[in-house]
């Protein structure tokens, strides 16, 4: 491998950090809409460009790369309604290439490290939902979705309804059943089963699903397993996590064993040698992608030998020994019936295309974002046009432009509204030169209210189950709450005003009781979650933790000057100004006062039994730890006065390395930074730096 420079990285200038904060927030919002809301507003291609820009900034200025950066989290780090389940080993994502030249470059880089003429597995990339199965002594004990790669949603009962997933493995003389087996795969709809499901829904007078992937995700997450059972989902296994008593020499051998035990594996997987053979498979499936029983959106290429996989290792989000070749997006034409607008949480007004439904890449599409008024003009689309629609990455629809020759003269230009469609407030850019226009009625605009109430329940905020988007809308429409400030004062009588939380007999539903219980439990969440829940611009979990750790109470944060706030490590001028500006608004302070009066804890109670033995030390945690989640490790460092940093530099005191630590471990060794294993981390927490002078991995 090429060694990295030993020079300390240049810290990001304030203007760059401000741009990174805004860009990271945009990416988080798009991840949230995609992974949690199932309502993306930009194409895959546009999202990849945003994420790529963010990654480029972090490569140039490593101090920007924090553990909760969107570049470091698989699946965005969001949770939904099911119980959390930790994976035994991380479920990583895959890096993508979009051209054969890029694929050959990747193969060349791999073979420079390992030697030439490697065996590669070529597997069709299923457009479905990742699922993690755990078998103990051959019996299925847990199934969980990918989630953030470390923790997913437990869906064991639902998984047991899928015919492809065996409850009990069948051993053979050649392949005895291991004591522990963690296996990963993709849940999907076979196209004929998806068509049958939609036909049945239409016959019942219900709306059909838009595409197989979304319907697979929704079907797997049903609260009633009987509904999942009726949906005829399928699964194919494509990887391993942790195992005991099973050490395959290659990925191909692993698949052979999985099949022998009764687990489903793809019949389309082929083992080849060299770059030319890999490219041949890419071209073959590019021409035959519609010949498969399920949707595919690319080809996954993996180094076959397990020892070489270990040698190549992984980054924080993807293995270095595998790559996904994504096929070019597919296109179709349809009629643009109207252009409508949507108002988001920050007041941004986004136009979207309302079209005649058209099938593209196996999905029925009728909506697509147009981003802003300038973009509508740039694309040159008119209402009534025949437009070219592309499914970027086979997932998100994008309007490319009009078919000008198809115009009849009846088409007309779209004009961005002058007033908010939700509250009729005049719209304007937040600052001169902005392409986006916004609704400035932040306090009362119904659209912004819904989004803020929903945000309070997010995983990065109070993490309140039951309070989903539908619940937020119902509470506001029934006037059970006036704004997010009323949430923690909700009573049973308030919930009975809504149809959502009221039984047919007129009593409080089980979900209503759960909501009240969850709200009550949330009152004791740590201060940093309160800060995130307040929807202060630029304040995500990292900045919130830094502020909470420094000041300890919301009153102290509220009373601090911009200079005092900016002096906090990990905050800076932009965030400090946003915090001070937020607390300068009367109705913002009223929200805080309402929460405080309702019993929400506004300060962190310091446990005097925990020593401040890491005061001023910068500590980086990388890889997967057995007894600490990433949040727990951060919390353990912060409460002892340390800084949980996201990148390694000469100022780093220690690097804690779990399984698959990636480049941060290499950087620490290169810079001479002490590296601790998990036992060393425990000693550090208990006794401070002196306790680990001679520790390491």
UniProtKB/Swiss-Prot annotation:
* Top-level lineage group: Bacteria
Known InterPro entries for this protein?
BRCT_dom, BRCT_dom_sf, DisA/LigA_HHH, DNA_ligase, DNA_ligase_AS, DNA_ligase_CS, DNAligase_adenylation, DNAligase_N
Q: Which UniProt keywords apply?
A: DNA damage, DNA repair, DNA replication, Ligase, Magnesium, Manganese, Metal-binding, NAD, Zinc
Which ranges of the sequence are coiled-coil?
Answer: none
Any Pfam family the entry gives: DNA_ligase_OB
GO BP, sorted A to Z: DNA repair; DNA replication
Q: Which reaction does it catalyse?
A: NAD(+) + (deoxyribonucleotide)n-3'-hydroxyl + 5'-phospho-(deoxyribonucleotide)m = (deoxyribonucleotide)n+m + AMP + beta-nicotinamide D-nucleotide
Q: What is its EC number?
A: 6.5.1.2
Q: Which SMART domains match?
A: BRCT (SM00292), LIGANc (SM00532)
Chain sites annotated for binding Zn(2+): 420, 423, 439, 445
The BRCT domain is annotated at 609-697
Active site residues of this protein? 125
Which family does the similarity line name?
Answer: Belongs to the NAD-dependent DNA ligase family. LigA subfamily.
Protein name, as recorded: DNA ligase
Gene source species: Rhodococcus opacus (strain B4)
Which gene holds the coding sequence for this protein? Answer: ligA
């Amino acid at each position: 491998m090429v060694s990295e420079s030993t020079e300390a990285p240049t810290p990001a200038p304030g203007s760059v950090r401000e741009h990174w904060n805004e860009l990271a927030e945009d990416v988080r919002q798009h991840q949230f809409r995609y992974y949690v809301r199932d309502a993306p507003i930009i194409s895959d291609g546009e999202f990849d460009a945003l994420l790529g820009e963010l990654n480029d900034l972090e490569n140039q200025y490593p101090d920007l790369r924090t553990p909760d950066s969107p570049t470091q989290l698989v699946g965005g780090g969001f949770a939904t309604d099911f119980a959390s389940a930790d994976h035994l080993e991380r479920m990583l994502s895959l890096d993508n290439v979009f051209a054969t030249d890029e694929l050959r470059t990747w193969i060349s880089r791999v073979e420079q490290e390992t030697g030439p003429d490697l065996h590669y597995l070529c597997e069709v990339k299923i457009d479905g939902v990742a699922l993690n199965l755990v078998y103990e002594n051959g019996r299925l004990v847990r199934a969980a979705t990918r989630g953030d790669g470390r923790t997913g949603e437990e869906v064991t009962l639902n998984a047991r309804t899928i015919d492809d997933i065996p409850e009990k493995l069948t051993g053979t003389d050649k392949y005895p059943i291991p004591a522990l087996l963690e296996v990963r795969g993709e849940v999907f709809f076979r196209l004929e089963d998806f068509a049958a499901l939609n036909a049945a829904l239409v016959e019942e007078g219900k709306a059909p699903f838009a595409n197989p992937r979304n319907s697979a995700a929704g079907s797997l997450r049903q609260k009633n397993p009987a509904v999942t059972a009726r949906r005829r989902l399928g699964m194919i296994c494509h990887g391993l996590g942790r195992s005991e008593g099973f050490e395959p020499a290659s990925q191909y051998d692993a698949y052979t064993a999985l099949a022998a035990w009764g687990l489903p594996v793809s019949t389309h997987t082929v083992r080849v040698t060299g770059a030319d053979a890999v490219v041949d498979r890419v071209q073959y499936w590019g021409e035959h992608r519609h010949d498969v029983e399920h949707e595919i959106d690319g080809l996954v290429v993996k180094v076959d030998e397990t020892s070489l996989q270990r040698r190549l290792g992984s980054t924080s989000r993807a293995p270095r020994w595998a790559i996904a070749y994504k096929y070019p997006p597919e296109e179709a034409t349809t009629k643009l019936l109207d252009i409508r607008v949507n108002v988001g949480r920050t007041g941004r007004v986004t136009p979207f295309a309302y079209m005649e439904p058209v099938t593209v890449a196996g999905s029925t599409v009728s909506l697509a974002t147009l981003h802003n008024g300038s973009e509508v003009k740039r694309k040159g689309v008119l209402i009534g046009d025949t437009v070219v629609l592309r499914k970027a990455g086979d997932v998100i629809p994008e309007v490319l432009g009009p078919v000008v020759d198809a115009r009849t003269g009846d088409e007309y230009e779209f004009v961005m509204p002058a007033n908010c469609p939700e509250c009729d407030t005049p719209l304007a850019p937040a600052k001169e030169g902005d392409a986006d226009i916004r609704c400035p009625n932040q306090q009362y605009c119904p659209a912004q209210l819904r989004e803020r109430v929903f945000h309070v329940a997010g995983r990065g905020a109070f993490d309140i189950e039951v309070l989903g988007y539908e619940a937020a809308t119902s509470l506001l429409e029934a006037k059970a709450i006036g704004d997010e400030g009323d949430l923690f004062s909700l009573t049973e009588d308030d919930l009975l005003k809504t149809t959502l939380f009221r039984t047919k007999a007129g009593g409080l539903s089980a979900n209503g009781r759960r909501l009240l219980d969850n709200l009550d439990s949330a009152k004791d969440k740590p201060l940093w979650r309160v800060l995130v829940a307040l929807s202060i611009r630029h304040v995500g979990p990292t900045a919130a933790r830094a502020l909470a750790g420094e000041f300890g109470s919301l009153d102290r944060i509220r009373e601090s000057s911009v200079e005092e706030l900016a002096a906090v490590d990990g905050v800076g001028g932009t965030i400090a100004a946003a915090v001070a500006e937020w607390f300068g608004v009367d109705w913002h302070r009223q929200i805080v006062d309402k929460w405080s009066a309702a019993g929400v804890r506004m300060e962190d109670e310091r446990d005097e039994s925990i020593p401040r033995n890491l005061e001023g030390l910068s500590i980086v945690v990388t890889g997967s730890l057995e007894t600490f989640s990433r949040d727990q490790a951060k919390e353990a460092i912060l409460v002892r006065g340390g800084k949980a940093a996201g990148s390694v530099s000469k100022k780093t005191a220690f690097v804690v390395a779990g399984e698959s630590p990636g480049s941060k471990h290499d950087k620490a060794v290169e810079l001479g930074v002490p590296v601790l294993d998990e036992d060393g981390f425990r000693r550090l927490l208990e006794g401070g730096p002196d306790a680990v002078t001679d520790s390491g991995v």
